[in-house]
Amino acid sequence: DRKMLLAAAERYLGRIMTENADALAKAPDSVLTLVPDAAGQPAILWGDSRLAVFAKGKNLLQPEIKFDRSIKDMAPEASQKVIDRVKLWVDAMKDKHLQGLVKIDALANEPETPAAVRALFAQIVDAGGILSRREIDQAIRALDNDMRGHARRAGLVFGALDIFHHALMKPGAVLWRTALFAAHDAEPMLEQAPDNAVHLKQGTFASAGHASRLGFRKIGDEYVRVDMVERLIKQAHEARQQGAIFAIDPALATSLGLSK
């Protein structure tokens, strides 16, 4: 009798899991989320159920997707449906939030891309799309004007202090970059800054390196998003060219929340 009850329970659970797999396969992308789990690992959830976590993979943009035991214990057909759906979702989210970085990675591996540009792109991808100009100075010096144009058409901004892709400041891009770095470095995900924040007070980040990974640069005792730093530098440069004393645009200062 016990064996019969266990067999019946297994059949019932198997049917439920199969139905869940079918539902997930047909569900929109919005039912899945990427969040840090209790250990800080980048985890993929369906509702409250953890399906998988990211781990170090081939490179930053290609993490290993480690599926939970519960998925592996499903019937093979149901398990494969879940695995395929999650992989499709990861690809779709990278294309949505990190499209510029994915494009740069592809260009870095195309023979038609000039060698000096490929070298620059490879370093940019390894850095997750944001890199201090000082760290990449030699690669920049190797570019002529045409090559710089090639890089700009791919979305790169050559700032006075940082080189970055303009689309990587959006909240979704920051979340995915943070998750990919956590997987690649086998470290917990960094705590996210508030969505669309451009200025943060001292103590927000454990290090300048953490700040850079979230798109911020330390200015004095505070942190400013790298694209906003470039706007400030551009305003100062334009004022200097006109022989005027630089005064920050009040609207920009207000948006940044800068201290006096």
Where are these regions (language model features)?
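Acidic, serine/threonine- and proline-rich low-complexity intrinsically disordered segments
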Residues: 1-259
